């Protein structure tokens, strides 16, 4: 008896014979002596042959030799039959009950249960553009940074420069892994000389905290920085729309004059009678907006007070779906949707935030290489389908020369503001120039044409609204 018996465990027929000679002449002992049947197949492929060889080596028949105990599954089954519920903590905002009482449809966003919409996402978008909307942002990751070396840490983990951020200002930043791949983004505000508040993506809060601690504990243990996670310590909300300043002025003692509290600024004060609230002026939706962080136990109170104060201003809540449409209209990317595990900063259109002139930072060597490519890489661009009523599914492939896959649609929606289809896509450099025509393959195999836009923003590319 010669030849391989169990390819996965590298067992030959002669190994079974050797087992019998050594006294391991029962089916279970021979199995363990040789490891035959202990690989991925768990004996389904080889054990019948193994027992036949053992029977021959011990001068018995197969029936009296017996077989090993079969391990489940006995017969092939689909992985779907084995898949169970993902056991993760379900986290909710302090305002969750209010959302349910007012018709919110839930969606799962990482570990969080969040309002997807309140019945009509398109109407929610229109209301934000025309009046004022309010959204629950509690899942937004929040990290408190204290210490004289915070700026060193920010310069290390972000691609842009943090040396000149003044107290009372906030700055958008992008984090890259050491291979230059975009791993998270967010806004960090300077609350005091050595005091900063960092926000991250909702799904990236834990990973960013780990990332900061990794650098502090393994590379720079001498730096004086204390990082405290505050995601659930604050209830966060954003009011957005042309009436948002008037609304906030009715419930706060903070001076909202745009000359003193301009775009990308932060202030601390009282909101709806609650002290020590942090308010910063940023614009993910593309509208004049204020992001408010209040102690979690007061979240529902502040939320309801804002709704009461804004009744004559047309205030209404909006959910994640409306927010995604609004940000797409503005051309703002979402890390993890408009990027993937290979997207580097320049490919995501974030080259303006990469400051290669500063000291070493995470991802710098790889980004230096990409910068020398002079744009010869994939690009994130805005595209419009020739048919304004056709919304290509996200992840639809972009092809050229027949069937060569060269890109994909990363985000797509029907814009209630523009009343047409709008998309973001990754395309090669040859197709990234404004006016380029690209071919999108739909799920049914149909092909449609789209045109690359000059600007990522479909609405207010000059930023007049959010800076108003």
Where are these regions (language model features)?
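C-terminal catalytic lobe of FAD-dependent flavoproteins
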Residues: 1-70
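Generic structural signal for well-ordered, non-membrane alpha-helical segments
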Residues: 5, 9-13, 23, 39, ...
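Short, well-ordered beta-strand elements within core beta-sheets of diverse protein domains
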Residues: 16-21, 141-144, 189, 290-291, ...
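Short acidic (Asp/Glu) and glycine-rich catalytic loops that position anionic groups and cofactors
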Residues: 27-34, 132-135, 284, 376
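Acidic, proline/glycine-enriched N-terminal capping motif
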Residues: 33, 49, 53-176, 181-183
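Conserved, structured C-terminal
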Residues: 96, 100, 114, 192-468
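N-terminal glycine-rich flavin-associated loop
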Residues: 137-148, 189-197, 237-239
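Well-ordered mid-protein domain cores that form the structural environment of catalytic cofactors
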Residues: 161-194, 198-215
């Amino acid at each position: 008896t010669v030849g391989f018996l169990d390819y996965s465990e590298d067992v030959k027929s002669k190994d079974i014979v050797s087992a019998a000679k050594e006294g391991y002449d029962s089916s279970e002992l021979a199995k363990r002596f040789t490891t035959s049947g202990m690989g991925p197949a768990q004996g389904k492929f080889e054990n019948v042959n193994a027992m036949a060889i053992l029977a021959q080596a011990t001068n018995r028949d197969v029936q009296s030799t017996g077989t090993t105990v079969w391990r489940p599954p006995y017969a092939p089954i689909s992985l779907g039959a084995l898949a169970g519920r993902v056991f993760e903590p379900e986290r909710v905002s302090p305002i969750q009950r209010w959302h349910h009482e007012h018709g919110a449809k839930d969606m799962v966003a990482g570990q969080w249960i969040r309002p997807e919409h309140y019945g009509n996402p398109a109407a929610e978008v229109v209301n934000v553009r025309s009046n004022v909307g309010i959204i629950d942002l509690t899942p937004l990751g929040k990290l408190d940074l204290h210490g004289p070396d915070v700026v060193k840490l920010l310069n290390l983990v972000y691609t842009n420069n943090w040396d000149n951020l003044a107290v009372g200002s906030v700055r958008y930043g992008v984090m890259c892994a050491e291979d230059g791949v975009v791993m998270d983004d967010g806004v960090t505000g300077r609350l005091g000389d050595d005091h900063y508040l960092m926000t991250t993506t909702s799904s990236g809060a834990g990973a960013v905290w780990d990332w900061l601690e990794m650098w502090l504990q393994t590379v720079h243990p001498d730096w004086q920085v204390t990082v405290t996670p505050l995601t659930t310590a604050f209830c966060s909300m954003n009011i957005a729309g042309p009436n948002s300043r008037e609304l906030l002025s009715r419930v706060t003692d903070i001076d909202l004059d745009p000359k003193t509290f301009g775009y990308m600024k932060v202030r601390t004060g009282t909101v709806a009678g609650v002290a020590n609230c942090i308010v910063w002026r940023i614009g993910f939706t593309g509208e004049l907006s204020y992001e408010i962080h209040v102690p979690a136990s007061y979240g529902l109170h502040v939320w309801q007070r804002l709704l009461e104060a804004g009744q004559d201003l047309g205030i209404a809540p909006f959910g994640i779906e409306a927010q995604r449409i609004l940000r797409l209209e503005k051309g703002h990317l979402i890390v993890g949707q408009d990027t993937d595990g290979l997207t580097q900063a320049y490919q995501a259109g974030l080259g303006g935030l990469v400051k290669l002139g500063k000291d070493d930072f995470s991802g710098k060597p790889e980004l230096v290489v990409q910068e020398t490519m002079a744009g010869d890489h994939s690009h994130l661009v805005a595209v419009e389908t020739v048919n304004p009523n056709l919304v290509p599914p996200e992840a639809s492939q972009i092809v050229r020369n027949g069937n060569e896959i060269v890109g994909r649609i990363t985000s797509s929606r029907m814009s209630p503001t523009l009343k047409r289809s709008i998309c973001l896509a990754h395309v090669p450099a040859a197709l990234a120039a404004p006016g380029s025509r690209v071919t999108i393959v739909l799920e049914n195999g149909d092909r449609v044409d789209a045109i690359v836009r000059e600007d990522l923003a479909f609405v207010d590319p000059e930023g007049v609204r959010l800076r108003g």
